Amino acid sequence: MSSSLQSNRQSLNRKVAVMGYPHVGKSALVLRFTQNIFPERYESTIEDQHSKHIAAFHRDYHLRVTDTAGQQEYTVFPRSCSLDINGFILVYAIDDRKSFEMCSNIYEKIVRTYGDTSIPIVIVGNKTDLSTQRVVRAEEGEELARQWDAKFVEITARESNRVHEVFELLLREIEISRGNLSPTERPNGNSPKRNPFKDDGKPCSIS
């Protein structure tokens, strides 16, 4: 494709939301993806909107990301997540059992709001850099993903490449759900020779 055609190629708009219990690293995940920074100090998020242009699957995307405020119980589903969201990232911390359990509550709210169990979801077990404090096994995240027909990965938001892979995985699921992409296609247009979501030699399913 010529450079003139590439410059005139229109970006496809997609909206995603990042949800989870307080203190699990949602904002760190979003800031690492959109600005390539990692906040060392925790600051409570009310709600932030971010965006990033990315190229994947031979297309250009304008990805709008809603960084939601963490709730203790999620008795009220965020209004910003009730309309026009194409996919969700549900984040828990591997050192926080309550945050993992809260993912089920959030999932139920998503299904109830959208009336659809097939909406693209990626479950993220964050803070693998705190592996010595782990209380949630990777197998538990994998099982939850199987139950929901979702995707599951474990990462640390400190690693930029891994964070980008999470958002590309969700984007891939969104495009598959819209009939725009083959399930075997990856961001570079090739089928992978290895599982791209392995952390320090430990298996992490994409189920």
Curated annotation (Swiss-Prot):
Segments for region (Disordered): 180-207
Biased composition (Polar residues): 180-193
Coiled-coil regions listed in the entry: none
Residue spans of biased composition, Basic and acidic residues class: 196-207
GO molecular-function term, one example from the UniProt record: GTPase activity
Chain residues carrying a lipid of type S-farnesyl cysteine: C204
Binding site for GTP: G25, K26, S27, Y42, T45, N126, D129, A157
Catalyses which reaction(s): GTP + H2O = GDP + phosphate + H(+)
Pfam families per the UniProt record, alphabetical: Ras (PF00071)
Localization annotation: Cell membrane
Disruption phenotype: Inactivation promotes nuclear redistribution of dve-1, induction of ubl-5 and complex formation with dve-1.
Membrane topology: Lipid-anchor
Record key words, sorted: Cell membrane, GTP-binding, Hydrolase, Lipoprotein, Magnesium, Membrane, Metal-binding, Methylation, Nucleotide-binding, Prenylation
Superkingdom, taxonomy of origin: Eukaryota
Enzyme class, first EC level, given as a word: hydrolase
Propeptide: 205-207
Family classification: Belongs to the small GTPase superfamily. Rheb family.
This protein's name: GTP-binding protein Rheb homolog 1
